[in-house]
Amino acid sequence: MKKTGIFNSEISRVIAKLGHKDKIAIVDLGFPIPSHVERIDIVLDFGRPTFEEVLKVILKELEVEQVILAHESSKKFEQIIKENIPRVEFLKISHEELKKLTNDVVAVIRTGDVVPYSNAILVSGVIF
């Protein structure tokens, strides 16, 4: 049995396969996920798990060099990301553009978060 890290086998598998500049998205409950993109649905209940809960676990195994989020996202949402990835580069685009960009991600992780615009694309970095 695995002792540490991410215990969700689908998320662990996707992160292990990511290369530099590959992208994954963490999205809220209502985000439209393209049908051709791998969907990892971890919704447990209305509001659970939150974006932040999922982000914290993913960061145990993923090096992130850039976060793409919508202009419409709240300052609190941006602060959550900054607190968890202090030196990350941000790219802000419209929510519509963010939805289009999810066509090019390796996978979308759907959370139970119900705070509007709690969606981000994480761009994989390198550890050296």
Curated annotation (Swiss-Prot):
InterPro entries the UniProt entry points to: D-ribose_pyranase, RbsD-like_sf, RbsD_FucU
Any Pfam family from its record, for instance, is: RbsD_FucU
Q: Could you tell me what this protein does?
A: Catalyzes the interconversion of beta-pyran and beta-furan forms of D-ribose.
Q: Which reaction does it catalyse?
A: beta-D-ribopyranose = beta-D-ribofuranose
For this entry, list what GO says about its biological process. D-ribose catabolic process
Report which residue ranges the record marks as coiled coil.
none
**Enzyme class name:** isomerase
Listed PANTHER family: D-RIBOSE PYRANASE (PTHR37831:SF1)
Active site feature: H20
Q: Could you tell me the keywords of this UniProt record?
A: Carbohydrate metabolism, Cytoplasm, Isomerase
Q: Where does substrate bind?
A: D28, H95, Y117, S118, N119
Q: Domain of life, per the record?
A: Bacteria
Q: In which pathway does it act?
A: Carbohydrate metabolism; D-ribose degradation; D-ribose 5-phosphate from beta-D-ribopyranose: step 1/2
Family according to the record = Belongs to the RbsD / FucU family. RbsD subfamily.
Q: How does it assemble?
A: Homodecamer.
* HAMAP family, sorted: D_rib_pyranase
Q: Does the keyword Isomerase apply?
A: yes
A GO term, aspect molecular function: intramolecular lyase activity
> Known EC number(s)?
5.4.99.62
Recorded protein name is D-ribose pyranase
What organism is recorded for this protein? Thermosipho africanus (strain TCF52B)
- List, alphabetically, the GO terms of the cellular component aspect: cytosol
Subcellular localization, as worded in the UniProt entry: Cytoplasm
